[in-house]
Amino acid sequence: MISWPDKNNLLSDGTIDCIWSCFSMNGRETKYQWAGPYMYSRQVVAVRAGSDIQSLSDLAGKRIGVQATTKAESLFLGEISSLLPEVKQVNSFETTEDMLAALRKGYVDAVAGHEALVAKWTNLDESSYRVLDESLYSSELGVAFAKGTHADLAAQLTQTLEDMKQDGTIGRVAEKFGLDAEKTVWGEQGK
């Protein structure tokens, strides 16, 4: 596990070879050498089960937890154009564990992140959390290598990932984690 805010430095100095963890390709197409996309993911919001927050518009004036340097952080800080209401406070955490602990303890009213990561945690305790039906953003996920490196490996990996999409492997894995296989593999429009 790496410190997510340090990911670019770790990649550029060779400490890590690639970034492969719910990493959005959207808006970063020219910043990295990409393999994929291997799946689609939505940015979603989770709240405590008893919360009065039912929709994105209910986030107005609320405290939001996000992981630092993520798409969710950019959305709530207004760095990416969105129709989100103005929130009271955006709290950025180094890890998803810290972000979800803040929700559990009531330090934030809601948390936002990639559907796969949020589902991983909320599915462990479905009686305590729920995910809003509306999504913040949809994106393609890929494997990022430092720009100008590993072009052959990225091409081979892209082909392998495409084969895994076609033969149903990625869909089966998605279902094991409580995700909609069709949307995860083929996006909102489906196959």
Residue ranges and their predicted role:
Residues 57-73, 88:
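Short loop->beta-strand "edge-of-pocket" segments that line small-molecule binding or catalytic clefts
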Residues 1-9, 51, 90-101, 105:
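Short helix-initiation/N-cap motifs at beta->coil->alpha
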Residues 6, 22-31, 75-78, 104, ...:
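A ligand-binding cleft/hinge motif common to bilobed small-molecule-binding domains
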Residues 72-93, 122-126:
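Ligand-binding cleft/hinge of the Venus flytrap
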Residues 11-12, 59, 103-104, 143, ...:
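Hydrophobic residues within well-ordered alpha-helices
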Residues 40-47, 72-76, 119, 123-177, 180-191:
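Periplasmic-binding protein-like
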Residues 1-58, 135:
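Acidic, polar ligand-binding/catalytic clefts
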